[in-house]
Amino acid sequence: MTKRITTLLIALMCCGAGFAQKTEVRRLEGEIGIGLVNGVNSLTLDNCATGPKLYGELRYNFRMLPIDVGMQVSGSYFWREAESQPERLKSRSYNVMAVADYNLFRGRRVSLFAGVGVGLGVLSMSHPIDIKNPDAHWAGYSTGEGKNKPCFSPRVGVELFNHLRLTVHYMAEEKANNHFGFSIGGVIGGGRKR
């Protein structure tokens, strides 16, 4: 399996190298954005509710390859609900990740990319979530002990006009914090040289 993935990555880089030589891009770019996330699993509770995501990212674009690498810092919140509780339980996740994107197509107005992030998540709760003596303010719940966990986040998206980036991602962290997300980011720098 590892050999197949390595072979595929090398083939993609070789194919993209010829295209990248024709498309000159600015080396550094930054991105600041907002988004929405929703938990994958409600666990022992009744429902997951959507919450906000804020993030910042700094990337370096390689000269001869359609690849960029960088660092992302983000914070995500979503809620879990239980019918027995009048308030929602907030799930917080703060992440620092090394990211890499492969630019599938880099046009003048539209660019498509697919990428991945790998790093560390600082979590407010972890699995299992147990409600022992429920009261109105979640005083009777407990969670697991894991607070710092590795995270993995595949993503795909489109960059419009070299300044607006729309991304869909999945964050795989710890069972109580896995989530899907959609984000809109403003890009400074980067893009094709004129």
Model regions and ranges:
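Bacterial Sec-dependent N-terminal signal peptides
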Residues: 1-26
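Short glycine/proline- and aromatic-enriched beta-strand/turn motifs that initiate or cap beta-hairpins
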Residues: 20-63, 181-194
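Residues that define the transmembrane beta-barrel architecture of outer-membrane proteins
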Residues: 26-28, 48-54, 90-96, 110, ...
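Short, well-ordered turn and helix-capping elements at secondary-structure junctions
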Residues: 36, 40, 102-104, 170-172
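Outer-membrane beta-barrel domain signature
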Residues: 41-47, 83-89, 141-145, 171-173
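Gram-negative (and chloroplast) outer-membrane scaffold detector with strong preference
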Residues: 52-131, 164, 184-194
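Predominantly the C-terminal beta-signal and adjacent terminal strand-loop region
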Residues: 72-81, 142-194
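Solvent-exposed loop segments that connect transmembrane elements
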Residues: 128-142
